[in-house]
Amino acid sequence: MPSAVQLAEKNHEKDSKFAKALHGESYKQTGLKALMSKARDASEVANDGYFKHWDGGVTKEDEDKRLSDYSNLTAHYYNLVTDFYEYGWGSSFHFSRYYTGEAFRQATARHEHFLAHKMQINENMKVLDVGCGVGGPAREICRFTDCSIVGLNNNDYQIERANHYARKYKLDDKLSFVKGDFMQMDFEAESFDAVYAIEATVHAPVLEGVYSEIYKVLKPGGVFGVYEWVMTDKYDDENEEHRKIAYGIEVGDGIPKMYKREVAEKALKSVGFEIEYEADLADKEDDIPWYYPLSGEWKYVQTLSDYFTIFRTSKVGRTITTEAVGLMEKLGLAPKGSKQVTNALEDAAVNLVEGGRQKLFTPMMLYVCRKPANEDI
């Protein structure tokens, strides 16, 4: 890990103009229809801006470049993949545990409810969602607890979509979504009762950086809950196969660097948090593995509607989508580079599954932490 990371320059006006040029009004659409509405020139800029970091770059110098350009790397990634995520997965961009008889959407909601329950979020709280995506978890947690939530996101397109959905589902009195870099938040200190992050802070170049910002905006005695993406204690960075899996996850998921579990734990403690609960929810020996939607194992499908979801997310479904997008690209219906994006997502899926099977990776290392009520103690 570099001793220091250069924070990104804040230029919200420039980012907003680029997002508008690229996406236009496509935030009102979904899936491949939204993809077809992108501006071709701006899409190429986003594509080049992302993939320049992954041209076989496995050296320490390549890694440091990705870490220093964390903000642009992540913003370009989500400019490219958001429509694919919603098409294949829905509006909650995270994994979940699965139980027998439980539908995919039900499992997704329960995973969000579990976090809110562990954090004891209630209707009197003002809550921050760090890396909120298009607002799926925020909407669900708002309905579950009746709390007020502010979603923080560095991607203008996702903010547009999140606010659009909040208005659509008449939750805009409780939900708001704002632009910001989670490594340098603009909120007043001690302004939130609770903060959560669901599979989002993995995009931070240094975990202490984002955790310290969360600590700063949290009120004394406030709670922070996070589902963190980490490599497990079984991961060996000197093992070529292990490193290949980690790199495949990084490339396909817009991550500057995957860190081990011990790094996340140390980072939380170093900024002042007291860890009240921790558990790797992927290491529970469940009958149905968390990665089954990507591995496409039909024996685990629990409901009729899930056959359609799992078909889209399975190897076969992903291949069909990739070839269809490639054809659309050739016909000029999709931006240049769209197939390259689906290939990267395929690389991510393969390595996420393999990392899960070998228990080298978890997307749900759960930490529930407390900011001391009296920091002088």
Curated annotation (Swiss-Prot):
Substrates-to-products reaction catalysed: zymosterol + S-adenosyl-L-methionine = fecosterol + S-adenosyl-L-homocysteine + H(+)
EC number: 2.1.1.41
Cellular component terms (Gene Ontology): endoplasmic reticulum
Pathway(s) of this molecule: Steroid metabolism; ergosterol biosynthesis; ergosterol from zymosterol: step 1/5
Transferase recorded as keyword: yes
Alphabetized Pfam families for the sequence: Methyltransf_11, Sterol_MT_C
Keywords of this entry: Lipid biosynthesis, Lipid metabolism, Methyltransferase, S-adenosyl-L-methionine, Steroid biosynthesis, Steroid metabolism, Sterol biosynthesis, Sterol metabolism, Transferase
Keyword Cell cycle: no
InterPro entries in alphabetical order: Erg6_SMT_methyltransf, Methyltransf_11, MeTrfase_SMT, SAM-dependent_MTases_sf, Sterol_MeTrfase_C
Top-level class of the enzyme under EC nomenclature: transferase
Any one Gene Ontology BP term: methylation
Transmembrane segments: none
Gene Ontology molecular function: sterol 24-C-methyltransferase activity
Signal peptide: none
Top-level taxon of origin: Eukaryota
Family assignment from sequence similarity: Belongs to the class I-like SAM-binding methyltransferase superfamily. Erg6/SMT family.
The name this protein goes by in its record: Sterol 24-C-methyltransferase
UniProt source species: Debaryomyces hansenii (strain ATCC 36239 / CBS 767 / BCRC 21394 / JCM 1990 / NBRC 0083 / IGC 2968) (Yeast)
Gene: ERG6
